[in-house]
Amino acid sequence: MKNYHTHTQRCYHAIDSEEEYILAAIKAGYTELGFSDHTPWRYHSSFHSSMRMEEDKLQNYVETLRALKEKYKGQISIKIGLECEYFPEYMEWLKETIDEYQLDYIILGNHYDETDETGIYFGRPLTKQQLTKYVDSCIEGMKTGLYSYLAHPDLAYYDNLDAFYKQEMMRLCQVAKDLDIPLEFNLLGYETCRQYPNETFFKIAKKMGNKVIIGTDAHESSALSNQRIYQLAYQYLNRLGIEPIEEIRFLR
């Protein structure tokens, strides 16, 4: 098993240290574990986000994982990444940060429009216009070529799963397919009964021929030991005719 959606206590809404996640993954039989804690951003204002690490903690995050990667070499492969939104005005900083820290990968977790300083949260009930903005933002992000996969692609909260919703999700899925970017089936959302995973969305993904990857979205180390929810997710996807993949494209 492999998982590339793992958080740590640094993001303020997860618990447990990097090493605790690694030990849980080894015990559960994972062969590769990728860490993708919420990225800091170098905001133009004095805004402080309560759901991501500060920029001055990033170096220690990377150094800690590199040391643990060496410590557990031969037992498990460790990849170092971040979960990032697509914030156009901050993308140059993100590219520089990826290169500076030689990150293995990043995933696109598109929580906010433009920036979480002032932008709307896409996981709240959306209007048609806001749903279109979500899809547009995901598409623009995927087209950068930076992201290894799209996390919780069905995060967008749109109550009426009507023809408009399906049209917009088809638009998203088509670009993901064209760019060979996998779509994540999110175990945290599945276990906690959020609006995602959305069966309507994954039926569209199946019809469009998208690749689907299971992401634990672990916010505590015990999530990596939950084989029951993992098997239920496999059964869910198999019922839809989807065989999830495990491999992703790395930046280096």
Task: Report the location of each language-model feature.
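An N-terminally biased module of ancient metal coordination in phosphate/nucleic-acid-related enzymes
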Residues: 1-84, 93, 159-173, 180, ...
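Short amphipathic alpha-helices and their capping/turn segments at secondary-structure boundaries
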Residues: 18-31, 89-103, 134-144, 171-174, ...
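Short, hinge-like loop/turn segments at secondary-structure boundaries
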Residues: 51-53, 124-125, 201-203, 230-233
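Hydrophobic alpha-helical segments and helix pairs
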Residues: 76-121
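Domain-core and long-helix interface of multi-subunit machines
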Residues: 107-208
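Mid-to-C-terminal alpha-helical segments outside catalytic/metal-binding sites
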Residues: 227-252
